Amino acid sequence: MTESERKQIIALIQREVIPAIGCTEPIAVALCVAKATETLGAKPEKIKVLLSANILKNAMGVGIPGTGMIGLPIAVALGALIGKSDYQLEVLKDSTPEAVEEGKKLIDEKRICISLKEDITEKLYIEVTCEAGGEQATAIISGGHTTFVYVAKGDEVLLNKQQTSGEEEEEETLELTLRKVYDFALTAPLDEIRFILETARLNKKAAEQSFQGDYGHALGKMLRGTYEHKIMGDSVFSHILSYTSAACDARMAGAMIPVMSNSGSGNQGISATLPVVVYAEENGKSEEELIRALMMSHLTVIYIKQSLGRLSALCGCVVAATGSSCGITWLMGGSYKQVAFAVQNMIANLTGMICDGAKPSCALKVTTGVSTAVLSAVMAMENRCVTSVEGIIDEDVDQSIRNLTRIGSQGMNETDRVVLDIMTHKGC
């Protein structure tokens, strides 16, 4: 691997693995509102928000940090009132109870209009127009949770990258394979990749804070109970499940707790991190081993998401848990061959799990994902692998990954439409 390629990979990871407070879809909407408000230069009197179906789906049922409220309107209001676009996915970290009350007024006065953007193919699309005193400003995020492609004040266009984006092109030219991910994780100079330890610190802290409260379905806390230990044991496996689900519990309930995200998703960051951290700590692994296993996990997720896309009908925890399965397999003493086996086993098992939006029950799916990650790693270490005569699995692991992402990005589009239709027509 050339030094230039190594630096490209490190830059890619540093772009994709970043802190986030709250579910990233409503937070990305708040970020877009903050940018439009800053461009307007005044407190908006009216805010119009147009969203792709996938953003709408992921923002409907999730808690917004520091508000005790669920859904988009309060995220939009706070984006306008206290949001700072420089904070990126931590845009609402300056929220106060007073701001929340003021935000409720904006909602009650019907100053916020949120609707579906029709006839677009981009699954991650946010368009915000803010108006005040006869003036208006527009901001558009597209393709990535923090990727602004258009900003304008009145007729003055300040940014227009709607046709081409240099950064997006640069990302696409970096072609990863599972072998390349594995080699990078094991050979990159330690000091160049040590930064990945921040994922362990931040996400473990989120889980530990969650154990102290009663967030969402409190799945993580429940898994530490006496009754649960009688059934599942007090083991590395049960600890992996409890820590990972606890961090997800807190996030989906809207706790003001930062986590390290991956590819625009906090739950993906949690699922790629905590199983690896818990396994490493409870098996006495060195700091270097933890760093390399975390790097393998996170870069595997980034690699799979390159062809899947930011948002899809496929639950992101399937992808993220595949990363942690790789990291755990390597920590168990696995070779590249066994890491590839773990990936094949994951794809054979979990492909097709739907995403029906971000919400407290995501903790259940995360737990399913990471329990399968451990199972897949254990199978791989016994040299057991789902074969290419079975279903969607190919002899070549990279082709199996492409099969997974093709199902998620193409095959499940109708599923996505039906899921959103069901969610928007429920009698609740």
Swiss-Prot record:
Pfam families: SDH_alpha. GO terms for biological process: L-cysteine catabolic process to pyruvate. GO terms for molecular function: L-cysteine desulfhydrase activity. Belongs to the UPF0597 family. This is UPF0597 protein BF3772. It comes from Bacteroides fragilis (strain YCH46).
